[in-house]
Amino acid sequence: MVIFYAVFISLITFNAHADSHHPQEFLQSISGTKNEGEQVYAHFCVNCHATKPLIPVGAPRIGDEEDWKIRLKQGMDVLFKHTDEGLNAMPPRGGCFECTDKQLILAIKFMLPHATQEKPTK
């Protein structure tokens, strides 16, 4: 009987979450905005990549030069590949299966140390 209640509560919780989780709508609404990378980061990446992450799994922290030093030497192609395929505790596409490649790249660039970020062109 306890198992029945556990399954029942899990299904209710999952259903309630599924009804409120619409990543495609969110991603469409931010597409092309000035801070698209920041918004993708805040919605999908922040739990593991914040300066004080909720889920401390050893992911590089936003803006932390030491965390990103070795990764930056590998180049953006490798950073994107690791994001796309997943690496260590990070799931493929950072868990954002609905994100476009461009959105993932913008989120990566947003997380890089400020000094390494590309300067905007006029």
Ranges and model annotations:
Residues 17-40, 56-69:
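Electrostatic cytochrome c docking/interface patches
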Residues 33, 41, 64, 75, ...:
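Stable alpha-helical elements in mature extracytoplasmic
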Residues 56, 61, 79-106, 111-122:
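Axial heme c-ligation environment in periplasmic c-type cytochrome domains
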Residues 44-51, 107, 111:
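The canonical Cys-X-X-Cys-His
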Residues 41-44, 52, 75, 86:
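Short pre-active-site segment immediately N-terminal to redox-active cysteine/selenocysteine motifs
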Residues 12, 39-42, 84, 93:
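Processing junctions and N-termini across compartments
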Residues 1-34, 110-122:
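Post-cleavage N-terminal segment of exported redox proteins
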Residues 44-47, 66-67, 73-75:
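Mature, secreted membrane-active peptide modules
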